[in-house]
Amino acid sequence: MKTTVKSFSELPTQELYAVLQLRSEVFVVEQDCVYQDLDGKDQKALHILGYEQDQLVAYTRIFKPGDYFEQSSIGRVVVSPQHRGKSYGQEIMKASLAFAKAENYTSIKISAQCYLDKFYTDLGFVFTGEKYLEDGIPHQAM
């Protein structure tokens, strides 16, 4: 998988559409969670895109410290359902963490869906609070 990092203004219309389509496919349709994915934060985020051939297969967005939380943060971690089981989730997160390290982001906050706790602890994240519900889905601050 090839990864690239782009600001919101660097995303061409077709690429932005692919990002929003993937996020909607997983976070709204697959997880049966009606919520507003377009939250007004994409403009401040940096977008980590993972491609196989010319198809977007994985994605995250990352915020510098102070743009979302006090620390930097990674969110909207998603892998296309048709491309799961190929370690793309780990690859996109490792690319996101490498970018954060290169930018000297010393602390990263995530809000992880609880069923993915092991995935995130294997990447070095630790629990930092109680479990909570976000849009009806159990989450864990890390």
Predicted features along the sequence, with ranges:
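Short amphipathic alpha-helix that is part of the acyltransferase structural core
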Residues: 1-56
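A conserved beta-turn-beta hairpin within the catalytic core of GNAT-like acetyltransferases
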Residues: 64-74, 84, 134-139
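Conserved GNAT acetyl-CoA-binding A-motif
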Residues: 93, 100-113
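Conserved catalytic-core motifs of GNAT/GCN5-like acyltransferases
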Residues: 111, 121, 126-141
